[in-house]
Regions:
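A short helix->loop->beta-strand "cap" motif at the edges of active sites that frequently abuts
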Residues: 197-203
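Hydrophobic/aliphatic anchor position in the core parallel beta-sheet
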Residues: 99, 203-206
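SF2 helicase/translocase NTPase motor core
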Residues: 2-58, 62-70, 74-196
């Protein structure tokens, strides 16, 4: 097994072992409970990333062969913070990013703007923030807004597409295809798929 990469098509079965070998520092210790203690009642440190959040940042860092990930965590597990940490790490390698943040409109201010202000690195904050392009995929004009913002984005930068509540977005795509009514989500989906095929550096995070 290579220390830097693994071919999942050839060695998919040993992927868990490869992860354990190459990311040892992120292995969680066994939970040892004392009688009468409830780990759910332990105070949570809110100003520090959890081990699993930090792991994802390392797994998707700029030099990683892996560029896409479905962050399949439960509600309240910190998926938003996880994505912001990934962006912090990528930006530290190069500031040339287009972060296309596809979200329901109701999540724009909370959690996204709230967590960006809290978790995004403060150095070069304005430049980091300028790279973030918000698209509300539940807008009646989502496809038009998306294509316009893609067209206006700096083509010399690498794109990272982040889809919040990805299951909801994919359900919209399915409804577009099956009902043959409306194409908002399908247009966005097809564009991202095509860009991914044409540019191997394009990244996708599904939350």
């Amino acid at each position: 097994m290579s220390k830097t990469t693994i071919n999942l098509e050839q060695n998919g079965r040993i992927f868990p072992s490869w992860i354990m070998k190459n990311f040892k520092k992120f292995v969680l210790p066994d939970i040892i409970r004392k009688e009468g203690e409830d780990p759910c009642n332990e105070p949570v440190t809110t100003d520090k990333l959890t081990t699993y959040q930090a792991f994802i940042g390392e797994y998707l860092n700029y030099r990683s062969p892996f560029k896409d990930l479905l962050v399949y965590h439960g509600v309240g597990a910190g998926k938003t913070n996880t994505m912001i940490n990934v962006y912090n790490i990528l930006y530290n390698y190069t500031p040339k990013w287009n972060i296309f943040l596809l979200i329901p409109a109701s999540l724009h201010d909370d959690p996204w703007l709230k967590d960006i202000n809290r978790w995004m690195a403060q150095d070069d904050f304005d430049k980091r923030f300028a790279n973030i392009i918000f698209i509300h995929y539940d807008s009646p004009f989502a496809d038009r807004d998306f294509l316009e913002k893609v067209k206006k984005a700096d083509a010399s930068k690498t794109s990272l597409f982040v889809i919040e509540e990805a299951h909801r977005f994919i359900n919209n795509v399915h409804n577009n295809v099956s009902s043959k009514k409306g194409k908002r989500a399908q247009v966005i989906y097809d564009y991202i798929q095509q860009e991914k095929k044409e540019n191997s550096n394009t990244r996708i995070m599904l939350l």
